[in-house]
Amino acid sequence: MSTESMIRDVELAEEALPRKTAGPQGSRRRWFLRLFSFLLVAGATTLFCLLHFGVIGPQREEFPKDPSLISPLAQAVRSSSRTPSDKPVAHVVANPQAEGQLQWLNRRANALLANGVEPTDNQLVVPSEGLYLIYSQVLFKGQGCPSNHVLLTHTISRIAVSYQTKVNLLSAIKSPCQRETPEGAEAKPWYEPIYLGGVFQLEKGDRLSAEINLPDYLDFAESGQVYFGIIAL
C-alpha cells in the first residue's frame, strides 16, 4: 500500500464519522486521527529515505575470489603490479676495509646494480637519459674535539658527457665540535650523519660520485650506515 492510499483511507475514515461528534468527544477523535495520519506519513517517509540511501536493504556483495569472475581491467592492474621494473637502479655500500678512503662496493649484501648501471673508477655511470633520484648517506664518528676546528663535508658530484667538468649537485658541511675539549676533561664520543638526496635530469654516460673530506672519521660499526645510489624515475 502506498503512502497516498494510507492518507486517503485516513481522510475517508474521518469523513465517515457521525456529524453528532461535533462535541468535545468528536474533536478528540478527529485530533487522534490527524495525529495518526501524521505519524503514518512520517514513518513512511523515513522508511523511504532509509531504503533510498542504502542504510537498510541488501548487503553489498564481496569481491569475487574466483579469477574468472574478475573483470579484465582488474586482472590487467594486478598483473602489471607484478611486472618487474626495467628502470636503471643502483645502491652501493662503503668498503669497511678500505683505510683512508671511501670506496664503493656493489658485491655486498644489500647492494644492487640493475638495468645497465655500471660502476667505474668509484663512480656510477648513468645508462640512459632521464630523471633520477640521487642519494647518499655517511656517518662520522670521533672522540673528543681537537684544537683545530673539525669540518665534515659530504658531496655528490656529476661529470656530464656534454661538458667534462666536475660539478657539485649536492653538498653539506657539519661541525661536530662547538669548542675544544679542555685539557684533562673526558673526551666524549660524537656522531654526525649527513644525508644528501635530490632529483636531477641526467644524460646517458654521465658519471656520478659521492665523496667526503675526512674518511678517517667514517663509522663502519654497523652495516647500512654509509651508502650511495641512484633510481630512475
Swiss-Prot record:
TM regions (residue ranges): 35-57
GO biological processes: extrinsic apoptotic signaling pathway via death domain receptors; immune response; necroptotic signaling pathway; negative regulation of protein-containing complex disassembly; positive regulation of apoptotic process; positive regulation of canonical NF-kappaB signal transduction; positive regulation of extrinsic apoptotic signaling pathway; positive regulation of JUN kinase activity
Major localization listed first in the record, in broad terms: membrane
PTM section of the record: The soluble form derives from the membrane form by proteolytic processing. The membrane-bound form is further proteolytically processed by SPPL2A or SPPL2B through regulated intramembrane proteolysis producing TNF intracellular domains (ICD1 and ICD2) released in the cytosol and TNF C-domain 1 and C-domain 2 secreted into the extracellular space. The membrane form, but not the soluble form, is phosphorylated on serine residues. Dephosphorylation of the membrane form occurs by binding to soluble TNFRSF1A/TNFR1.
PANTHER family attached to this UniProt entry: TUMOR NECROSIS FACTOR, TUMOR NECROSIS FACTOR FAMILY MEMBER
Source organism of this protein record: Papio anubis (Olive baboon)
Keyword Mitochondrion among record annotations: no
List of glycosylated residues: S80
Chain positions of site Cleavage: L39, L40, C49, L50, L51, H52, A76, V77
Name of the protein in its database record: Tumor necrosis factor
Lipidation (N6-myristoyl lysine): K20
Localization (cell): Cell membrane
Cellular component terms (Gene Ontology): cell surface; extracellular space; plasma membrane
Cytoplasmic compartment segments: 1-34
Protein role: Cytokine that binds to TNFRSF1A/TNFR1 and TNFRSF1B/TNFBR. It is mainly secreted by macrophages and can induce cell death of certain tumor cell lines. It is potent pyrogen causing fever by direct action or by stimulation of interleukin-1 secretion and is implicated in the induction of cachexia, Under certain conditions it can stimulate cell proliferation and induce cell differentiation. Induces insulin resistance in adipocytes via inhibition of insulin-induced IRS1 tyrosine phosphorylation and insulin-induced glucose uptake.
Gene3D superfamilies: 2.60.120.40
Gene symbol of the encoding locus: TNF
